[in-house]
């Protein structure tokens, strides 16, 4: 996922979904002192380790 370009809407959806996963007890994929799921998800996004992909429709 590193280097892939996401729209601002895709980034918001990915980070939000990942923050919810973390809040619900999913394992954190990075070492961090933070306990805020949103901060953790943002850091995971920055590092490119979020295990979520985006499937786009082809443009017509």
Swiss-Prot record:
Cell location: Cytoplasm
Molecular function as annotated in GO: DNA binding; DNA-directed RNA polymerase activity
SUPFAM superfamilies reported for this sequence: RPB6/omega subunit-like (SSF63562)
Reactions catalysed, as given in the entry: RNA(n) + a ribonucleoside 5'-triphosphate = RNA(n+1) + diphosphate
Record Pfam families: RNA_pol_Rpb6
InterPro entries with a match to the protein in the record: DNA-dir_RNA_polK_14-18kDa_CS (IPR020708), Pol_omega/Rpo6/RPB6 (IPR006110), RPB6/omega-like_sf (IPR036161), Rpo6/Rpb6 (IPR006111)
A single Gene Ontology CC term: DNA-directed RNA polymerase complex
Enzyme class, spelled out: transferase
Gene3D superfamilies tied to this protein: 3.90.940.10
UniProt EC number: 2.7.7.6
Superkingdom of the source species: Archaea
Keywords assigned: Cytoplasm, DNA-directed RNA polymerase, Nucleotidyltransferase, Transcription, Transferase
Subunit structure: Part of the RNA polymerase complex.
UniProt record similarity statement: Belongs to the archaeal Rpo6/eukaryotic RPB6 RNA polymerase subunit family.
Its job: DNA-dependent RNA polymerase (RNAP) catalyzes the transcription of DNA into RNA using the four ribonucleoside triphosphates as substrates.
Name of the featured protein: DNA-directed RNA polymerase subunit Rpo6
Classification of source organism: Archaea, Methanobacteriati, Methanobacteriota, Stenosarchaea group, Methanomicrobia
